[in-house]
Amino acid sequence: MGAIPSVLFFLLLLRVPESPRWLVKNGREDEAGAVLIRVDTAEAAAKEIRDIKDTLTLGEGSIRELFRPALRRPLLIAIVLAVFQQVTGINAILYYAPRIFEDAGFARMSAIGQSTIVGLVNMLFTVVAIVLADRVGRRPLLLIATGGMGVSLVLLGAAFRFPVLPASALLLIILLYIAFFASAMGPLVWVVMAEIFPIKVRGSAMGLATLILWLADFAVTLTFPVISDKFHPSTAFWLYAAMCACDLVFIWFFLPETKGKSLEEIERSWLKTA
């Protein structure tokens, strides 16, 4: 069963074209134009190829270049987004879902079944994010979803602190939280982190941001059971809700919208604000 998704991914990958940037870099401009024309006009495709050529002349960047004035802001945005993706509690809930459901009153086998439902909702709403990201925009989706996550976590903490709701209601609150996360913070953080960096330094920048993201994940995974045992599960959930509030403020004031902008346009915007 575990091999089925891998096989499907492999088969679908066979139909994915090479990126226009890679094709141009390797002297295959006609193929790059054909790929771009599938999603835009011939005129726009030609302009995009010219922009790609301009960026390719810059060469490869190093980690040291990430700390230049023009790149400090996108680097800070990527790092903060990476941290917020984790400290808003997603992997505490995913990793410890069976324990959370047992604490909520589900039998052990039933708790494992609820964890399966959580995974299914996570997958379905990731598809929603894919559909809406280029229609609605990154910022609106992230703002709405982060607010929804915060409200869900407040309700979840209250449900644990004041156990008057049936276990099924608690399950619905968790599924609501998962749906909000999967529709924005889950996939779109990776999208935004990739989009805001110039091509020259993207590899180094994404590597650094990813390292910090998983360090934050490690911290959350390590501290959730400690907080739950020493204080109360509601304390952890309310702490994650507070992180959602901080994330909302950060997105509102500092995150630019990247919808509809080419990578080259985004790069030029950083140069203007440096």
Segments from the language model and where they lie:
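Short helix/loop segments within enzyme catalytic domains
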Residues: 39-41
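Alpha-helical transmembrane bundle of multi-pass membrane proteins
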Residues: 1-31, 37, 56-274
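Charge-rich, low-complexity intrinsically disordered segments
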Residues: 34-35, 45
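Short, well-structured alpha-helical segments
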Residues: 45-54
